[in-house]
Amino acid sequence: MPKLQLSELLSLTKVEQTLRLAEVNVELEKLTAQERVVWALENLEGNPALSSSFGIQAAVMLQLVTEVKSDTPIILTDTGYLFPETYQFIDQLTDRLNLNLHVFTADESPNWQEARYGKLWEQGVEGIEKYNKLNKVQPMRRALDQLEIGVWFSGLRREQSGSRANLPILSIQNGVFKFLPVLDWTNKEVHYFLKEYDLPYHPLWDQGYLSVGDTHTTQKWEPGMSEEETRFFGLKRECGLHEDDGELDGSGI
């Protein structure tokens, strides 16, 4: 597969761009996750970064990317409402993997947002979307801009939800390459990878959480619930980070 120039692809029509990326994705599907990471770092134009919510299986992507390029910027969009265990997990993995961590937050503090808008997460889908835009989307766009990122790695997996089932490994979003190396991994593959590298799950995994985000929009799994129903009161699966331009994302791993 030839090297891809972002500027060249952005100059194409949407149809031409889609067809070109589809050809590449056919080949990427044949590679292992490790091979995909190496290929992306060698063949995609622009500085790389990995976004991480430091969720249940976050250690997988952190290991995969940093073992190839140890100084890759790790971007965390911190809402200020993460679980205490998440902040401890961030410290643990940052120390264990010597992460080049960059933390971005909303322009308004959590208290300021509540004073202005009330508790947005209690205001239905519209409120949740506004909350996500303020605390996830805008800080992430600022991160990509300030760090001059051209290749954005994320740990989304098709198995996690219906909204992710048809995502490609490589796409373009917000003017950068978006790359999902473990898109086709199963929970079993994730488990064995963590075991092989002696890496931990998020601490709340043992307490029955399948997905972890903010304290006020994360529920412990109960019998009969899907993973999607444990987030945002079942109203949404995605946190908004990559719903821009018709694409979907969320915490990933």
Swiss-Prot record:
Known NCBIfam families for this protein?
cysH (TIGR00434), PAPS_reductase (TIGR02057), PRK02090.1 (NF002537)
Q: Which family, according to the similarity comment? A: Belongs to the PAPS reductase family. CysH subfamily.
Q: What is its EC number?
A: 1.8.4.8
- What does the record give as its pathway? Sulfur metabolism; hydrogen sulfide biosynthesis; sulfite from sulfate: step 3/3
A biological process (GO) annotation for this entry? sulfate assimilation, phosphoadenylyl sulfate reduction by phosphoadenylyl-sulfate reductase (thioredoxin)
Select a single GO molecular function from the record's annotations and give it. Answer: phosphoadenylyl-sulfate reductase (thioredoxin) activity
Q: What is this protein called?
A: Phosphoadenosine 5'-phosphosulfate reductase
Keywords in UniProt for this one? Cytoplasm, Oxidoreductase
Principal location class: cytoplasm
The catalytic residues are 239 (nucleophile)
